[in-house]
Amino acid sequence: MRGRVFDHQCLWVVRNTITSPDKIDKMLDFALENNFNHLMIQVRGRGEAFYNSEFVPRSSVIFNDLFDPLEYVLKKAHQNNIQVHAWVNMYILWSSVEPPESENHLYYIHPDWIDQKGYNEEKFNQDNDNLEDSNDGEGYYLAPHHQAVAPYLLNVLREIVEKYEVDGLHLDYIRYKDYDFGGNAFALNNYRTQSGDDASIFLSAESTVEEKSKQSASRSLKWNNYRRNSVTELVKKAKEMAMTIRPDCILSAAVKPNLYIARDRFLQEWDVWLASGYLDWVIPMNYTPSFRNFAANIDLIYENFPPKYRERIIMGISTYNQSSSEAVNKINYSKLKQFPGVSIFSYNVLEENPDYYVPIKQALVK
């Protein structure tokens, strides 16, 4: 086997690949043949588990009740010296048009945990009659600032680390859905109790621009920092938990690639997570087909991080929205900028179009 261009050559593997041993074997053959030494295996998507869990409902697309996809991947990958990171979708809960099949899904058990866009006290209740208001295209998200959400998600991560010899935990959707989310009434009431302040003015569609502008900048900053810190605290606690149970476990997160947009729009301060040591790796999803925008996101990283932090940044590159030559240019540029690794999204695209992958394969070997 020829050598790797990067120390860490990672491949995202979407959950529909790990529903049977045959599909997993085919994926692992591909990874081995193509010099990938880290696999990000999606084991929690749409609030469902692709592993044996005591409390997360099992995915309905795994037809063999005796089959444990994560256990099988770990056994086979470790035999070939490939590291496995359990890729966990965090706050996003459901993204299908049809509702979940399992009655044990959080969608049914705790609709009161789901975040809302804007604020309207009347539409919040203990059932899910009005959840369509929170979908808004991408899917339903848990409210990061709801006091019950972080303990639940931490237990999801803890169960994986305790039961499986994973080499890493990979956090995805570790952010707010968007800037105008945060209107979960229960979480807002908790914020009001803790801070003595009312944030509903910033979220209500009935509030005029003039009314919002009258609110002090310090109140707005306080509210935004509170939401931001809700996410950061979960990342911090995840790191503490992983270090206690499995000290060698690599904690990483897939993040918005523009540092400022991540922080200000999605309340995802991954610069803090990296600098504070809450994460071992950060993987910006630098999926833009535009080389100029791709490079601009890297420029922001260079402006904000000295080399000792850039050594822990793995550059995420997409294959679904650009030509293979464009993807190769971004791989080469990531090497030029001295990042220690790349993560390719995703195996599913490459598996469906082998010819597309040939130039990318050549760019990843030396």
Locate the predicted segments by residue.
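Aromatic-lined carbohydrate-recognition surfaces of secreted/lumenal glycan-active proteins
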Residues: 83-91, 170-178, 203-206, 216-266, ...
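Catalytic domains of carbohydrate-active enzymes, especially glycoside hydrolases
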Residues: 23-49, 163-168, 278-281, 337, ...
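Aromatic- and acidic-residue-enriched segments that line the glycan-binding/catalytic groove
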Residues: 53-62, 92-133, 173-213
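Substrate-binding cleft/loops of secretory-pathway carbohydrate-active enzymes
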Residues: 93-96, 170, 179, 244-283, ...
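Active-site-adjacent "subsite" loops/lids of carbohydrate-active enzymes
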Residues: 4-10, 18, 86, 91-163
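Substrate-binding cleft of secreted/luminal carbohydrate-active enzymes
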Residues: 278-295, 301-304, 308-366
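Aromatic-lined substrate-binding rim segments of carbohydrate-active enzymes
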Residues: 28, 45-89, 226-245
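The substrate-binding groove and active-site-proximal loops of carbohydrate-active enzymes
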Residues: 9-18, 54-67, 136-154, 219-230, ...
